Amino acid sequence: DPLLVIHPAEVLADGETYVVGIRGLTNSAGESIEPSPAFVALRDSLDTGIDAIEDRRAEMDAAFGTLTAAGIDRSGLQLAWTFTVASTENLTGRIIAVRDQTLEWLESEGGDFTVTSVTPRSRDDVSVQVAGTFRLVNHMTGGGEPGQSFNYDSDDPDATPVPNEVVDVPFVCQVPIVAEEDPNLVLRPGLYGHGLLGSEYEIDYGGDVRALGNEAGILFCATQWAGMSEIDIGNAAATLVDFSGFRTMADRMQQGIVNFVALGWLRQHGLCDDPSFGGAEVDGDLVYYGNSQGGIMGSALAAVSPDISRSVLGVPGINYSLLLLRSVDFDTYEAIMEPSYPSRRERTLILSFVQMLWDRGEGGGYVNHIASDPLPGTRDDKALLFHVALGDWQVTELSAHIAARAVGATIHTPVVADGRSREVVPGWGLEPAVEGDDGSVIVIWDSGSDPIPVAGVPPSTSRDPHEDPRDDPVPRSQMKSFLIDDEFVDVCGGKACRAEPSL
C-alpha cells in the first residue's frame, strides 16, 4: 500500500499540541480519496453506537473546532488528528542530568588522562599528533560498550541515569604546523566531530580539518560519537535486524555527546599543558567543527555544551528519519533491515517511530535551544554556520534548511544561481544574511551537481558534492571568520556561492 509521509518544514515547539487536517487529497488518477466511514461519522456528527469511535468524539470535536477557527471547513476534511510534541524535559532531561553529574565528577575526581602515542610530523601540515585516553564516569550499563543502555537505579519512568563505573574514553589531538612557523601564535581550542560511523582519527585523514587548523590557528581534538562510531557498527546492524533494541543506540548517542562535553572540559583543564603538545599555547573560547554526522550531532552538542559558543556544521541536517531514506549511505543498511522488515512501508514507519528516541541523541531534539530558550548551564550567545552542498547525496539539504529556520539563521543571498533550485523561492522563510552578522547563517555551496529529487529518494545523477565545501579553501576562509572573528563574511562577492569539486 502507498504511504503518505508528511514532514513539517520547521521544527515544532517542545510540548505543544498540534491539530492536523487533510483535504484535497487525490490518488494518482486525480480522483478524490474517500475518508473512512469512522472518520465520516466523527466529522459529520453521526452517532454510531460503537465505543471505539464514540470514545474519541470529544477529542475530535475539539480538533474540528480548532480547524474551523483557522478557517478550515470540517465538511471537506478527509482526515484529521491531534498530536503533542515531546516536552523539553522529555527530550533533554536525561542528557542534562548526565552532563551535570559528569561535570561534578570531573571537578571533584576527574582530569586524569594517559597519552598513548606522540607522533611528531604525523603529516606535513601537523607539528605533532597526540593520542590517548581520558578517565570518565560512565552512565551506561556494563562498561558502556555498544549494546548497553542508560544505567538507572529506579523503575520510575521519570528517573534520570546514574553513574556506573569509570571508563577510558579515546581522544586524538593535532597541533597544526603553523604553531612551529609562528612561535608567538596563540591557538584556539577546538573540537572536531567525525562523520557517519567513523572515528576520532578522521581528524587525521580528513585533510580539511588539518587545513582549517592551520588556516584559522585552531588546535583540534576529537573523540568518538559513541553510539554512532565505527565500534558501534555491529550494534547498529543488530538494531536494523531487531528495532526493539534501538534504545541502546539512542542512549549511547547521548553518552557520546557528554563525552565531547567532557573532552571540552579537559581541553581547558590541563590536557594541552602536557609536554607531548610541545609547548603550544592554547587559549580562548572553545569552538566546534564537524561534517556530515558531525554536522547532524553538532547542533546537539552546541545546545548542551556549557563552553561552546560558535560551531561550523558542514553538510549538516537533523532528524534521521527524514535523512536516511534520502541518503545513498542508507542503501547498505536498509539491505540489512529488509529481511526482518520486508515492506518499505513498514521500514519507513519504523524509522519514523524511533525518531522519538533518536531526537534525544541528535540535533533534532535540541535546535529549539540554540537561538533562544538555552538549556540550563549553557551559554546564551550560541551561533551556527551551516555549510550545505547543493545536491548532496548523503545528507539532504532539506533538513539543513529546517534546522536553520529553527535557530533563526539568516541565509546568504543569492541563495543559488537562477535555475539551480527546485524550490519556488529558494531559502524561503530565512532572512538575507548581512556582512558582519554575528548570529547563525546558512550558506549553500554549488559545485555543479544536479539538484536533489523532489521524491523521498536519494539523488543518483551527476556526482555527489558531499565533500566539496570543506575541501575548498574559500568556504574554509568563511569558517575562519565565523569561528575566530565572530562574524559572517561574504566570500562569494555578492553572488551565489560556488565550491570547486573535490578531486
PLM-predicted stretches and their roles:
Residues 266, 271-325:
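Primarily recognizes the serine-hydrolase "nucleophile elbow" in alpha/beta-hydrolase
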Residues 144-168, 181-277:
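Cap/lid segment of the alpha/beta-hydrolase catalytic domain
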Residues 17-21, 28-39, 94-97, 142-147, ...:
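Short, solvent-exposed loop/turn and secondary-structure capping segments
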Residues 9-13, 162, 174-185, 211, ...:
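Surface-exposed acidic, glycine-flexible loop patches that form ligand/cofactor-binding
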Residues 252-255, 309-503:
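C-terminal subdomain of alpha/beta-hydrolase-fold enzymes, centered on the catalytic histidine
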Residues 140-141, 180, 196-201, 227-232, ...:
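Flexible loop/turn segments at secondary-structure boundaries
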Residues 84, 189-192, 219-224, 287-289, ...:
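Structural recognition of the beta-strand scaffold that forms the well-ordered cores
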